[in-house]
């Protein structure tokens, strides 16, 4: 219950039901449920995310991180955060209501013209330019995390895995994001910076053009092995040369040669093909017509545990919470949930520590094996995949590698004992 005490100290204890009227449910995911609501004082429409902290212990740090980042942001290109309220074990997070749905929703009725794509990408770039100027990395850019207002305004959302760079920490090395959109340097857990978001933007550009990211037909774990090894994806098909060049610029495997968000705003695909954001209302209307015709009912929650239907049948936006790899509790991510920067962070939830054998045994052994293979002219690809498998397993289940090593040692000891016993009886 320590995490509840921490939240109670940092969030208003005013009964949120006195301040807000909860209306239709417009989304459901691993972080809880999202409702359309009304601010009783201003009569403004808001989004209310309600999380049961007792049921979401594994997500406490992500919730803290999202609130921390959102409370520090002040940009028309970032979803606005209005405050948090704790009622019993339920945390109410009040945010800007964006009734146009996500960019992923807008893809469902069919392909987008390049003018729409360029306009959406321009607004994402403005959001990234702001975040990066604030020394923040989003780390999970994709169509599902781009929301639109009913007027066509485009805003970045879902900051549960966003990272903060300090003056003394120029690059990060935590393994987070969604596999298909993840930059090679993030997968390899090399030091990385804002340029990781630019790679994800390039994948998102392909997603907007094709309806899905590259390698979407493969298992996500397989994709994590392929992205660092393979050549960067390219935009194939009947698309303009400037669009293909934009994608190519984003998807340079060497992050040093990827342009910044500010530089990409000057790219000819952005400067020549974009229109005002009000132009995007055509896509929002298209999606609403498509939904009203009964499409998407069967597959609306196919990729995540979403329920996007309003209870009264109203066509509300689907607030998506797709599967994302989250940072381990021992990453150097600056955490802490606060309404004001002077407040202390909530007590972190204790979790299983990462395996010690990774640094003392696994990595040294793989390093020696790879060196021997290189000297003999052999390929180290299979060894790198196996080494990466340990890291991936550790992210989802900290401590699993140590358990594996204990079992292996016990098995070897039993085998050696049995063998010695047989030898001594002969």
UniProtKB/Swiss-Prot annotation:
Quaternary context: Homodimer. Interacts with CTTNBP2NL. Part of the core of STRIPAK complexes composed of PP2A catalytic and scaffolding subunits, the striatins (PP2A regulatory subunits), the striatin-associated proteins MOB4, STRIP1 and STRIP2, PDCD10 and members of the STE20 kinases, such as STK24 and STK26. Interacts with TAOK3 (via N-terminus); the interaction promotes STK25 abundance at the level of protein expression and/or stability.
Source organism superkingdom: Eukaryota
Location of region: Disordered: 291-355
Ranges annotated as biased composition (Acidic residues): 299-314
GO cellular component, one term: Golgi apparatus
First-listed, main subcellular location of the protein, grouped into a coarse class: cytoplasm
Residues bearing the modification Phosphothreonine: 174
Name the UniProt record assigns to this protein: Serine/threonine-protein kinase 25
Post-translational modification Phosphoserine, affected residues: 278
Names of the cofactor(s): Mg(2+)
Keyword Kinase in record: yes
Record organism: Homo sapiens
One BP annotation, GO: Golgi localization
Keyword Cytoplasm: yes
Activity control mechanisms: Interaction with Golgi matrix protein GOLGA2 leads to autophosphorylation on Thr-174, possibly as a consequence of stabilization of dimer formation. The C-terminal non-catalytic region inhibits the kinase activity.
Subcellular location field: Cytoplasm; Golgi apparatus
Residue positions of the active site: 140
Classification of source organism: Eukaryota, Metazoa, Chordata, Craniata, Vertebrata
Described function: Oxidant stress-activated serine/threonine kinase that may play a role in the response to environmental stress. Targets to the Golgi apparatus where it appears to regulate protein transport events, cell adhesion, and polarity complexes important for cell migration. Part of the striatin-interacting phosphatase and kinase (STRIPAK) complexes. STRIPAK complexes have critical roles in protein (de)phosphorylation and are regulators of multiple signaling pathways including Hippo, MAPK, nuclear receptor and cytoskeleton remodeling.
Family statement: Belongs to the protein kinase superfamily. STE Ser/Thr protein kinase family. STE20 subfamily.
Pfam families attached to this UniProt entry: PDCD10_N, Pkinase
Reactions listed under catalytic activity: L-seryl-[protein] + ATP = O-phospho-L-seryl-[protein] + ADP + H(+); L-threonyl-[protein] + ATP = O-phospho-L-threonyl-[protein] + ADP + H(+)
């Amino acid at each position: 219950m320590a995490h509840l005490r921490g939240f109670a100290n940092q969030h208003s204890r005013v009964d949120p039901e006195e301040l807000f009227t909860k209306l239709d449910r417009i989304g459901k995911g691993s972080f809880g449920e999202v409702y359309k609501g009304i601010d009783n004082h201003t009569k403004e429409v808001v989004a209310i995310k309600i999380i049961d902290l007792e049921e979401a212990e594994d997500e406490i740090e992500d919730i803290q991180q999202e609130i921390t980042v959102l409370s520090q942001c002040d940009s028309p290109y970032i979803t606005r955060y209005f405050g948090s309220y704790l009622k019993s074990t339920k945390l109410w997070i009040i945010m800007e209501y964006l009734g146009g749905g996500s960019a992923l929703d807008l893809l469902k009725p069919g392909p987008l013209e390049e003018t729409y794509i360029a306009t959406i990408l321009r607004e994402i770039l403005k959001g990234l330019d702001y975040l990066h100027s604030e020394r923040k990395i989003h780390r999970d850019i994709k169509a599902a995390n781009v929301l639109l207002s009913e007027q066509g305004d485009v805003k970045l959302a879902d900051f549960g895995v966003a990272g903060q760079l300090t003056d003394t920490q120029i690059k990060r090395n935590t393994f987070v994001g969604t596999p298909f959109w993840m930059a090679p340097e993030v997968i390899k857990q090399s030091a990385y910076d804002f340029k990781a978001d630019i790679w994800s933007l390039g994948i998102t550009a392909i997603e907007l053009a094709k309806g899905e990211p590259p390698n979407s037909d493969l298992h996500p774990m397989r994709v994590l092995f392929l992205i660092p090894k393979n050549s960067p994806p390219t935009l194939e098909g009947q698309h303009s040369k400037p669009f293909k060049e934009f994608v190519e610029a984003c998807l340079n495997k060497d992050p040093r040669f990827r342009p910044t968000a500010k530089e990409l705003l000057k790219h000819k695909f952005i400067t020549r093909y974009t229109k005002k954001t009000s132009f995007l209302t055509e896509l929002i209307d298209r999606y609403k017509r498509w939904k009203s015709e009964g499409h998407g009912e069967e597959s609306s929650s196919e990729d995540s545990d979403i329920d996007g239907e309003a209870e009264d049948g109203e066509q509300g936006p689907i607030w998506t919470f797709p599967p994302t790899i989250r940072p381990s509790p021992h990453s150097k991510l600056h955490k802490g949930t606060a309404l004001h920067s002077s407040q202390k962070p909530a007590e972190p939830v204790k979790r299983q520590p990462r395996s010690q054998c990774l640094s003392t045994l696994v990595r040294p052994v793989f390093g020696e094996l790879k060196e021997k293979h290189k000297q003999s002219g052999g390929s180290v690809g299979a060894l790198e995949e196996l080494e990466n498998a340990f890291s991936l397993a550790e992210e989802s289940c900290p401590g699993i590698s140590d358990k594996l090593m204990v079992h292996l040692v016990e098995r070897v000891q039993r085998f050696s004992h049995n063998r010695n016993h047989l030898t001594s009886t002969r």
